[in-house]
């Protein structure tokens, strides 16, 4: 495949896939990510996808479209998508571009996104 040597980590936490985007996502990587997530949903039968964009400083119309397409594909496979950690500047850019990301809910951080999908992430309770 591409010679970038960089892949976007996709972790499975129970019934949820956690995708963490960092820095700039090139077109080829974004399209590969879309295929990877769709395949993982299909094979693992997860019910939710959390896309953490707290490490993304700039969103263009292409990335916005890819995020919307990931959410649409997930929905067709009976999984809900939550976008987590959006920076204020990214939110403003999406509005200016007219990208409302239909079918995708948003959360302030990954912990809240997981809770929206019914996964409890209680910290500080119990042992160590």
Segment roles from a protein language model:
Residues 1-4, 119-128:
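Intrinsically disordered or compositionally simple regulatory linkers and C-terminal tails
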Residues 90, 97-105, 122-127:
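Conserved glycine-centered short motifs in functionally critical loops
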Residues 6-34:
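STAS-typified acidic loop motif
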Residues 44-47, 51-100:
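Amphipathic alpha-helical interaction surfaces in cytosolic regulatory modules
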């Amino acid at each position: 495949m591409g010679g970038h040597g960089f892949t976007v980590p996709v972790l499975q936490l129970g019934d949820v896939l956690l995708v963490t985007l960092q820095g700039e996502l090139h077109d080829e990587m974004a399209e590969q990510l879309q295929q990877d997530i769709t395949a993982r949903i299909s094979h693992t039968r997860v019910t939710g996808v959390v896309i953490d964009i707290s490490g993304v400083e700039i969103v263009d119309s292409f990335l916005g479209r890819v995020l919307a397409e990931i959410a649409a594909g997930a929905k067709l496979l009976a999984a809900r998508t939550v976008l987590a950690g959006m920076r204020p500047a990214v939110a403003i850019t999406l509005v200016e571009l007219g990208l409302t990301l239909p079918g995708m809910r948003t959360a302030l951080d990954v912990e809240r996104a997981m809770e929206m999908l019914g996964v409890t992430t209680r910290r500080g309770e119990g042992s160590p």
